[in-house]
Amino acid sequence: HKASSAARPILDGFFLFSTTHRMLKIALPNKGRLADDTRELFGDAGLPVLSRGDRALSASLGGEFEALFVRAQDIPEFVADGVADVGVTGWDLVCESKRPVERRLDLGFGECRLIAAAREDSIVRSIDDIPAGARVATSFPNVAREFFQARNQNVEIVPISGAAEIAPLLGIAEVIVTFSITEWRLR
């Protein structure tokens, strides 16, 4: 009679891993508004998350869960690759990553919308005013490309990281596309 291999520990190098029980790994944003909202949600559920002031990379949550504190934009990749079992991040970041993850639950926070902006002295006053061939700067090139393709608008996507709003002011692009929780204009 052969024992089930699923119940035996597996020896891998110098580390012993048990296949009978392990903590659920949850990837959580390590900073920003999304991290603050997530910490509050988990605290309300009886799973207090450490303050990020301690610079921890991970923490146990109630003995059954392990929190992994990572950049919000890396969470889709960590979940898709199996580094984390589940994650909390923005849907905009999931869409941009193009990673095969499943959306399970809308937590009711972190809502934002895709916006386009141009300089105040620009002829562009709406999405429809963006001329063919216009340069559009964004830190969300995949989402922006899909958006303009769906509208049959031929634009040149200029991928940038960080503060996209500087691009029109520097002449890098005529328009920016980003996600925002508020209305704003370039000056």
Task: Give the residues covered by each predicted segment.
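Low-complexity, intrinsically disordered segments with a bias for serine/threonine
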Residues: 8-9, 22
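Domain-level signature for soluble enzymes in the chorismate/prephenate branch of the shikimate pathway
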Residues: 18-187
